[in-house]
A protein has these predicted regions:
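Conserved small helical "lid"/interfacial subdomain of P-loop NTPases
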Residues: 199-228
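Conserved NTP-binding/hydrolysis module of P-loop NTPases
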Residues: 73-107
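P-loop NTPase Walker A phosphate-binding motif
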Residues: 44-74
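A structural micro-motif at secondary-structure boundaries
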Residues: 353-376, 430, 437-443
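Winged-helix-like regulatory helical subdomains adjacent to P-loop NTPase cores
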Residues: 225-226, 234-317
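Sensor-1/coupling segment of RecA-like P-loop NTPase cores
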Residues: 144, 148, 156-188
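Conserved P-loop NTPase "ATPase switch" module shared by AAA+ and STAND
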Residues: 128-152
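Positively charged, aromatic-enriched patches within helix-turn-helix-type DNA-binding elements
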Residues: 365-368, 377-413, 419-422
């Protein structure tokens, strides 16, 4: 990726000037930490948890809350390094981070104890506490530490004890809630897991999405027309990772002369130039999210409807979002991806999702009410999407071998079906003298 493209970020944001948004979450987190409250930050893959932890690790960001040195020392640990470590290695890494932070804060620390022991860690924390400083430990990828089979309930009880003795606070970041990520039930029973306030980290707001484009483009001295930015946000939604992908490919298309940045209006053909590369790069990430869903959740996501617990869980994973009390896909690229998946028990074609067993139909997430005859016609058309289905075959699907002296009965049924599936009735295309087909109306 060329350095001239300001949307190059794919991993964690490490520079303060590149960080965008999350003002509300930051204020809440820092306010809680100032009061010694531990926090469990939960959010799906690539939503920006690591970026947020790195950002608040910067002293000027914490200063307004009096969490800067020497008032408070922040220690950031990446738990990927500790996935299989024994307790001694965890203590030693914590101790090293504390000593570095204490040195930067000009605190005087006596380190006569042997490193790699709980006693050494406790001794240093005691000295820091006596000098009036608080400590916050940031634990990124915390599920790897919590699932470490070398760490017993006693280990986590000791970590909890440090909060009582020295007012130490923890900020953990994980994809799933703490109760779902521990290696054993006995570990979960540790009082350590009862001290956290849970904070979800979700999608950007619309304003934050626009700010991301504005900031990235401004720093690079580049521009994108507002109409193009609006389309990109509609395409990939408000997920910061996918917004970076969209911005990157838009700049590449302009640099390659595939799109004219000076235009005020763009055609569908212009947008299609962007859709391809954006969806190709997003495919593997969407595939990862899909494969990590249970079959039940895949079914619920495909119809954007189902048990409220499943819908809320998919919302927490930033796959669905609630708009006017209705759950909708978080992005157009996600909707297209889901439509390409094979979901047992469902037929997916165009805007329609059909559950044959339950006799239910949805059009772009909205449940439609069809008669048995209308349902049978739509099922047959959706099974052969893009192909012409002969009128005789449609009649057979509805009436079987029953002879009815009404040559217009199929036309009448199709007309009623189009009204029933409005505004998607124009997907049902008449092929004069042959039959009907389900395909996009513009084709």
């Amino acid at each position: 990726m060329g350095v001239d493209n300001p949307f190059f970020h794919r991993g964690a944001i490490r520079h303060v000037e590149d960080f965008v948004g999350r003002e509300a979450e930051l204020a809440q987190m820092l306010g809680l930490l100032r009061n010694g409250q531990s926090i469990s930050l939960i959010g799906p893959r690539r939503i920006g948890k690591s970026s947020l932890l790195l950002y608040i690790g910067n002293t000027p960001i914490r200063a307004p809350f009096q969490l800067d040195p020497p008032h408070s020392l922040f220690v950031l640990l990446d738990c990927q390094e500790l996935a299989g470590s024994p307790p001694e290695e965890v203590y030693e890494l914590l101790l090293d981070g504390l000593l570095d932070a204490a040195t930067q804060a000009n605190l005087t620390i006596d380190t006569t104890e042997q490193p790699g022991t709980y006693r050494a860690l406790d001794r240093v924390l005691q000295q820091i506490y006596q000098q009036g400083s608080s400590v916050v430990v940031l634990l990124d990828e915390f599920e790897l530490l919590a699932a470490n089979q070398h760490l017993t309930p006693y280990f986590f009880a000791r970590l909890r004890g440090l909060t009582t003795k020295y007012g130490l606070a923890y900020l953990t970041a994980s994809q799933r809630p703490l109760f779902a990520i521990t290696a054993e039930e006995t570990v979960l029973s540790s009082p350590f897991f009862n001290i956290f306030v849970t904070m979800p980290l979700g999608l950007f707001t619309e304003a934050e999405a626009h700010e991301l484009f504005h900031r990235r483009l401004e720093r690079a001295g580049q521009t994108l027309p507002q109409g193009l930015i609006a389309y990109l946000i509609k395409l990939v939604g408000l997920h910061p990772f996918f917004l970076h992908i969209a911005g990157y490919h838009a700049i590449q298309a302009i640099n390659n002369g595939e799109i004219d940045a000076s235009l005020d209006h763009y055609t569908e053909a212009d947008f299609q130039v962007l859709d391809g590369p954006i969806e190709v790069e997003a495919e593997s990430h969407l595939g990862y999210l899909w494969q990590n869903l249970s079959p039940e959740d895949q079914h619920v996501l495909a119809i954007a409807d189902g048990p409220i617990e499943s819908l809320r869980q998919l919302e927490q994973q930033c796959l669905l979002q609630k708009v006017d009390n209705t759950y909708v896909y978080s992005s157009e690229i996600l909707r297209r991806f889901v439509r390409r998946q094979d979901v047992p028990g469902l037929i997916q074609a165009g805007p329609f999702v059909i559950d044959e067993q339950r006799h239910q139909v949805w059009g772009n997430g909205r449940e439609l009410s069809l008669t048995t005859s209308q349902f049978s016609i739509l099922v047959r058309l959706c099974r052969h999407v893009g192909q012409v289905v002969r009128g005789e075959d449609l009649e057979m699907a509805v009436w079987g071998d029953v002879l009815v002296d009404d040559p217009d009965r199929l036309k009448t049924l199709i007309k009623r079906l189009r009204r029933a599936v409005d505004p998607f009735g124009n997907w049902i295309i008449s092929e004069r003298g042959v039959g009907y087909a389900l395909r996009p109306p513009e084709e």
